[in-house]
């Protein structure tokens, strides 16, 4: 059984230090000179939607564990072009309660398929400029195969099942809402 932390805000300056992330750290026991076999740590699923810039390093640190030898990441960023048009930013919208619920289901699926320890899924909302991260998924596991496969499954499932919409904003002052061809509700269009 895993604990779940869901937040609609990102790291504020007050929460940047590890000691101030109590809600996350309270779920894990810190090793204090004990034998590695004595370390007790509850698995965590951390889901967050935010309008703030994502820190890949901070998200990856949330899943680090003394019980794990691997942390695998997926980082989705805004690229500067689409079909010959210059993209200046993306704008994301989501139905957050449903999106959180769908991501929770994805985390549960991952735990049924792979022996992973912690899962973090962070997604930006609002404007995301070129080269900035819109999605960060981090998974820790004892060995790399499980976390690598879980991260791949997580992003594929997120794109297929989670109600998040993306608008591309182009340099020539036009924009276009993009249909996600992978999502189940758009199939057959």
UniProtKB/Swiss-Prot annotation:
InterPro entries assigned: MoaE_sf (IPR036563), MOCS2B_euk (IPR028888), Mopterin_biosynth_MoaE (IPR003448)
Pathway membership, UniProt: Cofactor biosynthesis; molybdopterin biosynthesis
Top EC class of this enzyme: transferase
GO cellular component, one term: cytosol
PTM-bearing positions, type Phosphoserine: 20
A GO biological-process term: Mo-molybdopterin cofactor biosynthetic process
Chain sites annotated for binding substrate: 143-144, 159, 166-168
Polar residues: bias regions: 1-30
Key words, A-Z: Cytoplasm, Molybdenum cofactor biosynthesis, Phosphoprotein, Transferase
Catalytic reactions of this protein: 2 [molybdopterin-synthase sulfur-carrier protein]-C-terminal-Gly-aminoethanethioate + cyclic pyranopterin phosphate + H2O = molybdopterin + 2 [molybdopterin-synthase sulfur-carrier protein]-C-terminal Gly-Gly + 2 H(+)
Listed Basic and acidic residues bias regions: 32-41
Described purpose of this protein according to its UniProt entry: Catalytic subunit of the molybdopterin synthase complex, a complex that catalyzes the conversion of precursor Z into molybdopterin. Acts by mediating the incorporation of 2 sulfur atoms from thiocarboxylated MOCS2A into precursor Z to generate a dithiolene group.
Subunit composition and interactions: Heterotetramer; composed of 2 small (MOCS2A) and 2 large (MOCS2B) subunits.
Name the UniProt record assigns to this protein: Molybdopterin synthase catalytic subunit
């Amino acid at each position: 059984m895993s604990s779940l932390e869901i937040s609609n805000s990102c790291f504020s300056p007050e929460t940047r230090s590890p000691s101030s992330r109590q809600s996350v750290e309270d779920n894990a026991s810190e090793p204090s000179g004990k034998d590695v076999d004595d370390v007790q740590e509850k698995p965590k699923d951390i889901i967050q939607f935010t309008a703030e810039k994502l820190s890949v390093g901070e998200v990856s640190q949330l899943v680090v564990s003394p019980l794990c030898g691997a942390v695998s990441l997926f980082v989705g960023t805004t690229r500067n072009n689409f079909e010959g048009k210059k993209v200046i930013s993306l704008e994301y919208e989501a139905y957050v309660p449903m999106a959180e619920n769908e991501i929770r289901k994805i985390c549960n699926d991952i735990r049924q398929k792979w022996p992973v320890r912690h899962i973090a899924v962070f997604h930006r909302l609002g404007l995301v400029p070129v080269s900035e991260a819109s999605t960060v998924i981090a998974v820790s596991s004892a060995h790399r195969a499980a976390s690598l496969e879980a991260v791949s499954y997580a992003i594929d499932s997120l794109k297929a099942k989670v109600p998040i919409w993306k608008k591309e904003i182009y340099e020539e002052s036009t924009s276009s809402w993009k249909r996600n061809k992978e999502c189940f509700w758009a199939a057959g269009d």
